[in-house]
């Protein structure tokens, strides 16, 4: 029955939040910068959540690297994804560094008892304000190679991967946090370019989850991909053969407003093919969904969705003190921090 991922207000867990998290519809939560003061505090918060909420919760965060890194002080300053191809000349060294970054991020998060960081970004190009240097590169082959290496690092640290934002958010200028973007390119271009990294990583069984974009691709469908049966069922499931979990992007974003109120957005995303729904920064919207969302699904569909959820929990746990004394972590920290400093000054 669990489907919703919600957020917390501050740096400690409130009793009313415990009650929300224990609701049968809630599958987990996502942490933000506002929930973070320092490493001991965030570690204590996660421990408190695990102890007080009497069910397994998928605890997630956006710790991609570069400008999207919710926890900074006390953690490795991970480089922006664009920096690998932009600053490192040798292709093999690009891949090695991307793999090290994926491992470092995942190891640090699992050492906090966090299950999942929503990564990697598979969007092409850097023109979109919402994406920018979060993208590895502007060509599909380079994105595939670098993302594949980053994924290998994440998997080695025991973390599941989430490819985003399907089928590609890189060629719209509008920010879906603020409005619903439209991609007016011919469908042939999207299938020849943007969808390729997703297609190849799915074929290699490297993506555990996919997050669709709050973007309307006008030559393909009149609904945002996050609420589109065409994109999620016809293309992602049937054509690409994806069997992993599908997350909605945040249904609290303005880009999702095209689909209606919060309950309607949730219903449309589930009906389109999403397994798990993110609803953030909208506490009243969360209550509306928990009070009014009805899951009309068959038993096989329910069981398949819950099985996909189970695959997203972390497979390994690191001890923070032991992790940060390893030669691997120390070398990675020095190398990755230097790369990000170089990127910021370039």
UniProtKB/Swiss-Prot annotation:
Chief localisation class: cytoplasm
Active site residues of this protein: 177, 249
The entry's keywords: Cell cycle, Cell division, Cell shape, Cell wall biogenesis/degradation, Cytoplasm, Glycosidase, Hydrolase, Peptidoglycan synthesis
SUPFAM superfamilies in the cross-refs: (Trans)glycosidases (SSF51445)
Cellular-component GO terms for this entry: cytoplasm
Site label Important for catalytic activity, positions: 175
Keyword Hydrolase: yes
Pathway connected to this protein: Cell wall biogenesis; peptidoglycan recycling
The EC number(s) this enzyme carries: 3.2.1.52
Domain of life: Bacteria
Catalytic activity: Hydrolysis of terminal non-reducing N-acetyl-D-hexosamine residues in N-acetyl-beta-D-hexosaminides
A GO term for molecular function: beta-N-acetylhexosaminidase activity
Binding site for substrate: 62, 70, 134, 164-165
Any one of the GO BP annotations: cell wall organization
Role played: Plays a role in peptidoglycan recycling by cleaving the terminal beta-1,4-linked N-acetylglucosamine (GlcNAc) from peptide-linked peptidoglycan fragments, giving rise to free GlcNAc, anhydro-N-acetylmuramic acid and anhydro-N-acetylmuramic acid-linked peptides.
NCBIfam families (UniProt xref): PRK05337.1
Family designation: Belongs to the glycosyl hydrolase 3 family. NagZ subfamily.
Protein's name in the database: Beta-hexosaminidase
Organism: Actinobacillus succinogenes (strain ATCC 55618 / DSM 22257 / CCUG 43843 / 130Z)
Lineage, opening ranks: Bacteria, Pseudomonadati, Pseudomonadota, Gammaproteobacteria, Pasteurellales
Encoding gene, per UniProt annotation: nagZ
């Amino acid at each position: 029955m669990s489907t919703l991922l919600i957020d917390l207000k501050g740096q400690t867990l409130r009793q009313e939040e415990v009650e929300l998290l224990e609701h049968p519809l809630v599958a987990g939560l996502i942490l933000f910068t506002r929930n973070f003061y320092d490493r001991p505090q965030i570690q204590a918060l996660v421990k408190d959540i695990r102890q007080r909420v009497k069910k397994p919760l998928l605890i997630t965060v956006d710790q991609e690297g570069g400008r999207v890194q919710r926890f900074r002080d006390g953690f490795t300053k991970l480089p922006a994804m664009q920096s690998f191809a932009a600053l490192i000349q040798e292709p093999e060294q690009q891949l090695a560094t991307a793999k090290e970054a994926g491992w470092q991020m995942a190891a640090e998060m699992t050492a906090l008892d966090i299950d999942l960081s929503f990564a990697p970004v598979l969007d092409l190009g850097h023109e979109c304000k919402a994406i920018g240097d979060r993208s590895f590169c502007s060509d599909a082959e380079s994105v595939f190679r670098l993302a594949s290496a980053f994924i290998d690092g994440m998997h080695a640290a025991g973390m599941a991967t989430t490819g985003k934002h399907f089928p590609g958010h890189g060629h719209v200028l509008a920010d879906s946090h603020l409005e619903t973007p439209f991609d007016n390119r011919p469908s042939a271009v999207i299938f020849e370019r943007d969808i390729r990294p997703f297609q190849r990583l799915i074929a290699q069984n490297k993506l555990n989850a996919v997050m669709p974009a709050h973007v309307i691709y006008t030559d393909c469908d009149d609904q945002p991909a996050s609420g589109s049966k065409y994109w999620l069922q016809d293309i992602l499931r049937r054509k690409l053969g994806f069997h992993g979990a599908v997350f909605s992007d945040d249904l609290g974003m303005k880009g999702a407003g095209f689909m209606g109120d919060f309950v309607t957005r949730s219903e449309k995303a589930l009906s389109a093919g999403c397994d798990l729904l993110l609803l953030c920064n909208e506490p009243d919207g969360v209550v509306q969904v928990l009070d009014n969302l009805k899951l009309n699904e068959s038993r096989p569909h329910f069981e398949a969705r819950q099985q996909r959820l189970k695959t997203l929990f972390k497979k390994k746990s690191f001890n923070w003190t032991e992790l940060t004394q390893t030669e691997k972590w120390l070398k990675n920290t020095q190398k990755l921090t230097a790369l990000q400093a170089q990127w910021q000054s370039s």
